[in-house]
């Protein structure tokens, strides 16, 4: 199971909304990726829910209309989802909000899928610099405080190096481990410094009965999702076979019954399959991950489907 680029960039999924005029294209876009969903024609309530539950929102409508409705749910820079606009004729794909938080990448990927033109205007991408926000995504973390991000971008664009107290992932040419830079990103939060707040991770696994090599295949899926194994605290499942995943990660294991999952409510759960509905369930992997994470938990990876198992990841900021 190899995740698509969209799954790596938007693990909480992509919601597609449209005007009635754009519904046909909206439904098509909702099937473009394994983690994209057409959630319906626009209403304020539906957009608010999508903005809360998904990493990205695609609006199939005119740009002025999208700007007007997006203002209802957008907060500050870097808060809320990446928002992309696709005109109803499918000619242009335009990042509207949170360009560095994935809107630029999604616009380019969508444009490639439907033969449209992506309109990218931000400087960092034009210079080929990987955005800072991608660092947080790749490391399963949050950047705080967000009001400092703009000053870090100015330094990047001026050719300055930013120091870190961790080894940066590949692709961030402007970052290096060290202490002799004017600007730093650290995992230990200090006033006036951009902080990378790491998530403690909780993995939920759903599976058919007696799945062969479940532990091996689930571990491979976590590796493809670049989940930091050392930060997985608990693995949970309805199948005893998943205990091997926890053992391989050095994490705790909790076995759930289906009855423990039936009363769980969360607006951000993925639409259940017909099989789950017939069992009186709204989900398995996502519910387990969220129950393990507790009241402060956040769904970080919407359920990923293997051949005969599903996997989801929730997190709590450390």
Question: Where are the regions a protein language model picked out?
Answer:
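Active-site microenvironment for binding and transforming phosphate-containing groups
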Residues: 230-318
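Conserved mixed alpha/beta catalytic, RNA-binding, or beta-rich assembly cores of soluble enzyme
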Residues: 2-9, 16-245, 308-318
